[in-house]
Amino acid sequence: MVYDNIKREIIGMLKRMPNKQADWDNDLLPTLKAMFNPKSVSNAKSQLISEGVISQEIVDGKKIITLIKDPYELQAPNVFDEEMFLAYYTDKLKEYFKHKLSTEGPEWDIFDVKEFIMHFPESGDLNDKLIEHPYEVRKSITNVYIEAYEELFNETPNVEFIHIRNPIDCRISLSELSSAHKGKLVEFRAMILQATKLKLRYAKGFYYCPKCGATKTLDLGFWDKPKEVGKSLTCPADGCDCKGLIFDEDLSGKVDFQEIKVQTPLQESIYANKHSTTVFYEFNKPKKAVYSGYVKIVGVPIVKENKNGSVGELYIHAFYIEKDDEDIEEIAKNLNEKDLELINRIAKDKNVIQKLSDYAFREVTGYDMIKRAVLLQLVSSGTNIDMRTSIHILMISDPGVGKSTLMESLIQKFPFVKKVYAVTSSGPGLVGSVVREKAEFGDSWVLKAGVLTEADGGVVCIDEFSRNKEVYDYLLGVMEQQKIEINKAGVIDAVLPARVAILAACNPRFGRFNPDLTVWEQINLPKELLDRFDLIFVIKDKIDKKKDEDIADFSIDNYNSKVRERKGKSSGKKFVINGVELNDELLLKYVLYARQIEPEISDEARKIIKEYYVSVRKMSEAKGTFGISARQLGSIIRLAVAHAKLRLSEVVKAVDAEEAIRLVDTCLKQIAYDPESGSIDIDKIAGTPKSKRDKVEKVLNIIKEISNSRDDGLAPEEEIYERAERAGLSEKEVEDAINYLKRVGDIYSPKSGYWQLMS
């Protein structure tokens, strides 16, 4: 039939449109012109109108095409005709496969639907047949693949099926999956929650007759028991009435497969409930299993019948799974023109970052610098640059200053933020673990993703950070390397992505800051872990009449505002930036849009950063302290880049570098400023500043000298003080040094008034 393929394509496209109606020039014609000759497309449309299959009317200057009937559906029942399919597609498929095998190599076993139709535009009908008859079409395509392989390499490939990727117009959300999709090809995005190691199953059963030797090959389903299936089979040979065939394990086709538990990804769960399902993914050849991250799945929903014959749970038989790490960033890529206009207007405000942080953390009063820093953190994680960009922040504070409220505010507004309590968490719970548990097909080793992997590309808030030392070792590598390596010998070997920013909060060593001790003496965390944080903020609850009055007013106003909203009244307070009224949805879109920007560092920013780094190190050298290292330099760069991103700038400018330095410098002065030397000394962070190290070393040497001069090896305390005083130390400095040496285990007191070196 003339123009038959084009007419089928037009009808198929209209059937997938809402109300089977579309704008000809904008919705249909561009795609059709890419597939067929434009003149033929026009003629095919005219024929369909004259046949009464479609109608055309002009609405607001647009050609609106409506499908009236589908003649092809009336002419043929929904049955797959393999002979007709192969007659039409064999040559095209074989040409495609030979090209791919020649360019990609003999290991290649994937059929890309979209790519195939681009090469053969007249073959759009293949996609529809694949969606309606996925198993039959895949089997036919696999047979053609085997023929092409044999003709090319003069040997038979060891494949049971071809993988199918990039089908057209069958994308659904996991939350939309229902029994209506049973047996049809679908494509959806998901996040992996857990996955088993590779297991083996028989995908194709080879059977023979025990009486005459006739053979039969049969495709086996996931729940089919090969030997039980054989008992119900009859001999295929004419004249043989034998019932019950023998299953031959050696000649039957085996495939590796995984059971994978998946969940609705973040992007789709922002405005809808999360859904989960189990996916069975098969491999022709030994391949790297899929254990974590965001994936795109092409497969067929299948149902396991219950023993009583009722319909059971819905599963997915995956034809292909591929990594798809964009997820929530897709929201930014799909913003409409109005969203982009509002976002760009907001970005033009000179104080955009301060105003955005005021709105984002409006539940918390004060702490402007901390709120700005956390906003920078939100846009720092999840990039594909091959170096750490995530900003890690630690807040050490007196109880009740609002750090938990700040974390809760983040979780409510940004779906890529997760929160855990260190005291109730475990190391494996954070990074992932390999456990043995019951799966659909027997017990199996299962890799369960941890919180840090599930939050890949986002932010993880860890409250009560200092109350569980077990998690420290697990966090060290993740915070720097942004990945998790899991190895269970002989079972599972995987590298999981964990490009997360950590926002941690804890109280000081004794619960509340002691004014008689320096800040660094009250931080109860190991130095190697503290080194991983870009910013460490110290928050003290000081009595201040004006500040306390402001907090009281803020709390009451906040309560009244919530009550008014509950009653359906206006809270009376609006946040407007450059004429744009801000709301939580627009804030999320702004942050997501900013996250995808990858700015370059300008020469002016480079000069500012370099001068600060060099000058601080030079000043420290002159005073005999250890100023800053390459770690702090990395922090400044990450913060400057994030600051530029929040301004929606493609270039890191002077203002970005200056704000980054201001943040780092403020934090260092809070925790690493040594008043005796008058300079920053990063050894002070969870360690000892040089001024104190020198005094401790003097006292330790005095104890050594006295101990070595006595037969009993003891150093009388009175003599220690006398010698130290002659060396220029005060009584308080000697007392502090002795207490420090005792605490770190360098000395001990075997009896009152005497000190001895630890051997």
UniProtKB/Swiss-Prot annotation:
Example GO molecular function: ATP hydrolysis activity
Q: Which residues form the MCM domain?
A: 352-556
Q: Which UniProt keywords apply?
A: ATP-binding, Cell cycle, DNA replication, DNA-binding, Nucleotide-binding, Transcription, Transcription regulation
- What biological processes does GO assign it? DNA replication
Q: Which PROSITE patterns match?
A: MCM_1 (PS00847), MCM_2 (PS50051)
What SUPFAM superfamilies does the entry give? Nucleic acid-binding proteins, P-loop containing nucleoside triphosphate hydrolases
Return any one Pfam family short name.
MCM
Q: In the UniProt record, which is one GO cellular component term?
A: MCM complex
Provide the binding site for ATP.
Answer: S397, D398, P399, G400, V401, G402, K403, S404
What family is this? Belongs to the MCM family.
Protein name as catalogued: Uncharacterized MCM-type protein MJ0363
Recite the lineage of the species. Answer: Archaea, Methanobacteriati, Methanobacteriota, Methanomada group, Methanococci
